Amino acid sequence: MEPTVHTKEEIIERLRRISSELRELSVERLGLFGSFARDEQRDDSDVDILVEFAPGRKNFDNFMNLNFKLEDVLQRHVEVVTRESLSPYIGPHILEEAEYVSFGN
């Protein structure tokens, strides 16, 4: 089991390490937002992830499997949201703050 992530850089490195598994789940983009993106995380902070799936591939199984995989790899509670699920009030802030992780094609 991997140790718990403590920095934004550790999160990005681990996400890149599992890029092939992310592609198998039809993930096209991942964006980090929240306390880790702002370098304001605490020991009990969760990891906030914005996900974009390939067209027609967003489904319950891919969403839940992504959530389980991220929690396993990062060893933290993870909140995964899609662009479509964002509130019209907070969504623009999240989209502006999100730092997208490049993990190849």
Could you tell me what each predicted segment is?
Residues 1-29, 37-43, 56-105:
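Catalytic core of pol beta-like nucleotidyltransferases
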Residues 50-52:
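Short hydrophobic/aromatic beta-strand micro-patches
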Residues 32:
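Conserved histidines in hydrophobic membrane contexts and catalytic metal-binding motifs
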